[in-house]
C-alpha cells in the first residue's frame, strides 16, 4: 500500500513539474513585457526546486562567468574593454516530455537592454520529436547550422574568436530535420531558419524584411577524425544570397591532444567563387592531466571580393589573430573552471562597428562555475 501511495505521489509531482515548465516558459514571455525578468527567474528557480521530485522530467543548471580583462590597442589601454566584468550568467533547462518528445532551453540573463528583446537573449528554445531511432524533427530557436568547430562552444566557453564569429548571430528560429545512421557515426541535418542577417539588414537600411537561411550539415565520427561540414545559402538582403562552404575538421592524437582546423569559403554573385572571401581557423589543445587544458589558436580572415555581400567579414578586411591560454578544473566534475589567455590581433578591419582592431592585445583571466539545481 505504501508503495502505491509513493508511486502516486511521484506521478503527481512529475505532472506538476511538467506543468510548471510550460507555465514558466509562457510566463517568461509575459514578464518580458513587465520588465521583471530577473525577479521571475529567481522565482522559477525557487519553485522548481521546491516542487521537483525523484522522477524528474527536467534538468536545470545555472551557469556564470566573471573575468578580469586588460585590452590595449598599439600600447594604449582601452578603458572600456578593461577591468573586472561579469561575462555571462544563464540557465539551461532540458528534459523529456515523453519517450519521443524532448525540449531544451538556454536563457542568458545578462543580455537585456532597451534595444535587445527577451528572445534575443534566448540562445535556444526548441522541441524535438524523435519518431524513430534514426529520425528527429526540431522546431524552435536553435543554432544556425553553419559548420566549423569555432562556432559550436557555448558562449560561456568562448575566449577569443575570429571576426566572423563576433558578427554572426548564430541562434535563430526555424525548423530542422536530422537523420542519424544506424552506426551512430554520421548525422545529416537539413534546416530552414530566419536569416542571421535579417536584423543587421534592418539596422543598416531601416527597412524590415522577411529573410531566410537554408543549411545542410554533416557531422561524423570516424576513428581519430571528426567532421563538421556544411553548405549554406543565406539571405543578406531581400532575394540576395551569399553561399558558405564550411569545413570543420577535428583530429584526436591519442587521448590528450586534439587539433581543430576550420576552413570557410564565402561567395555571392558577381565575384570569384573560391579564395577571395574566406577564413581559416586552427586550434591545438593538450591535456597533461585531467584538471588542466592548454591551448593555442590562430585565425586568418580575408575579404577581397569587391562586393558588399559579406556582412560578417566586410570587403577589404584582412585580419590575423593569435593567442594561447590555459584552463584549470579544481573539481572532478569540472563544474568550476579557472582560465587565462592572451591574444593579439593585427591587420585591417573595414567594418566600422567591428570587434577586432589592428595591434590589439588582450589579457583575460576568469572563473566559471556551474550549479546543477535539478
What residue spans do the PLM features occupy?
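Loop-centered beta-sheet repeat module
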Residues: 189-240
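Short, well-structured alpha-helical patches and their helix-loop capping segments
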Residues: 162-169, 206-210, 299
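Outer membrane beta-barrel
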Residues: 54-70, 80-197, 219-223
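Outer-membrane beta-barrel pore domains
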Residues: 65-79, 115, 126, 130, ...
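Exposed loop/turn and edge beta-strand positions of beta-sandwich/beta-sheet ligand-binding modules
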Residues: 87, 121, 133, 171, ...
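Polybasic, lysine-rich low-complexity intrinsically disordered segments
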Residues: 4-7, 12
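Bacterial Sec-dependent N-terminal signal peptides
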Residues: 15, 20-55
Amino acid at each position: 500500500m505504501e508503495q502505491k501511495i509513493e508511486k502516486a505521489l511521484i506521478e503527481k509531482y512529475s505532472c506538476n513539474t511538467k506543468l510548471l515548465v510550460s507555465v514558466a516558459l509562457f510566463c517568461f514571455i509575459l514578464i518580458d513585457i513587465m520588465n521583471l525578468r530577473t525577479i521571475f527567474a529567481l522565482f522559477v528557480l525557487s519553485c522548481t526546486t521546491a516542487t521537483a521530485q525523484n522522477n524528474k522530467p527536467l534538468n536545470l543548471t545555472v551557469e556564470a562567468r566573471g573575468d578580469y580583462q586588460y585590452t590595449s590597442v598599439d600600447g594604449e589601454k582601452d578603458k572600456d574593454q578593461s577591468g573586472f566584468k561579469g561575462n555571462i550568467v544563464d540557465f539551461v533547462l532540458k528534459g523529456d516530455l515523453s519517450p519521443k518528445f524532448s525540449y531544451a532551453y538556454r536563457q542568458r540573463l545578462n543580455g537585456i537592454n532597451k534595444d535587445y528583446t527577451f528572445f534575443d537573449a534566448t540562445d535556444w528554445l526548441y522541441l524535438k520529436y524523435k519518431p524513430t531511432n534514426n529520425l528527429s524533427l526540431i522546431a524552435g530557436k536553435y543554432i544556425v547550422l553553419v559548420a566549423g568547430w569555432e562556432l559550436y562552444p557555448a558562449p560561456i566557453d568562448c575566449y577569443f574568436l575570429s571576426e566572423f564569429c563576433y558578427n554572426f548571430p548564430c541562434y535563430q528560429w526555424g525548423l530542422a530535420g536530422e537523420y542519424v545512421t544506424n552506426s551512430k557515426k554520421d548525422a545529416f541535418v537539413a534546416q530552414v531558419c530566419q536569416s542571421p542577417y535579417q536584423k543587421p539588414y534592418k539596422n543598416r537600411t531601416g527597412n524590415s524584411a522577411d529573410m531566410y537561411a537554408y543549411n545542410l550539415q554533416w557531422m561524423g565520427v570516424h576513428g581519430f577524425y571528426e567532421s563538421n561540414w556544411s553548405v549554406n545559402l543565406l539571405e543578406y538582403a531581400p532575394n540576395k544570397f551569399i553561399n558558405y562552404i564550411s569545413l570543420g575538421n577535428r583530429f584526436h592524437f591519442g587521448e590528450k591532444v586534439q587539433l581543430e582546423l576550420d576552413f570557410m569559403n564565402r561567395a555571392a554573385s558577381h565575384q570569384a567563387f573560391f579564395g577571395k572571401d574566406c577564413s581559416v581557423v586552427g586550434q591545438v589543445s593538450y591535456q597533461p592531466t585531467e584538471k588542466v587544458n592548454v591551448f593555442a589558436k590562430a585565425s586568418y580572415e580575408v575579404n577581397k571580393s569587391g562586393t558588399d555581400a559579406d556582412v560578417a567579414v566586410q570587403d577589404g578586411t584582412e585580419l590575423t589573430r593569435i593567442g594561447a591560454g590555459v584552463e584549470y578544473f579544481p573539481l572532478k566534475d569540472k563544474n568550476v573552471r579557472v582560465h587565462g589567455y592572451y591574444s593579439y590581433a593585427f591587420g585591417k578591419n573595414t567594418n566600422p562597428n567591428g570587434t577586432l582592431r589592428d595591434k590589439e592585445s588582450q589579457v583575460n583571466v576568469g572563473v566559471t562555475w556551474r550549479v546543477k539545481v535539478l
